[in-house]
C-alpha cells in the first residue's frame, strides 16, 4: 500500500501529530480532540496545517 505520513499541526492547540495520508477513519487531536483529518475514499482531507511530510512512499 503506497501512502505518505504527514506531520499535521492542530489549529486549536498547536499540537503536532503524525497522520497517514490515506486515513480510513477520522483522526482527532490527541490533546484537544479537534478533527485533524477525515477520510475521502482516497487521500484524506486535512483540517490542520501540514508541517512536513515525514515519510513519502
From Swiss-Prot:
Query: What are the GO MF terms of this UniProt record?
Result: structural constituent of ribosome; zinc ion binding
Could you confirm whether the keyword rRNA-binding appears in this record? no
The record's keywords, sorted A to Z, are: Metal-binding, Ribonucleoprotein, Ribosomal protein, Zinc, Zinc-finger
* Alphabetical list of InterPro entries matching this protein: Ribosomal_eS27, Ribosomal_eS27_Zn-bd_dom_sf, Ribosomal_zn-bd
Residue ranges of coiled coil: none
Q: List residue spans of C4-type Zn fingers.
A: 10-32
According to the record, cofactor stoichiometry and binding are noted as: Binds 1 zinc ion per subunit.
GO cellular component terms attached to this protein's record: ribonucleoprotein complex; ribosome
- Enumerate the cofactors the protein uses: Zn(2+)
| GO BP annotation list | translation
Residues binding Zn(2+) are 10, 13, 29, 32
Presence of keyword Lyase: no
Q: Extract the Gene3D superfamilies matched here.
A: Zn-binding ribosomal proteins
SUPFAM superfamilies assigned to the protein according to its UniProt record, in alphabetical order = Zn-binding ribosomal proteins
Q: Which family does it belong to?
A: Belongs to the eukaryotic ribosomal protein eS27 family.
Subunit structure as annotated in this protein's UniProt entry: Part of the 30S ribosomal subunit.
Q: What is the protein name given in its UniProt record?
A: Small ribosomal subunit protein eS27
Tell me the organism's taxonomic lineage: Archaea, Methanobacteriati, Methanobacteriota, Stenosarchaea group, Halobacteria
What's the gene?
rps27e
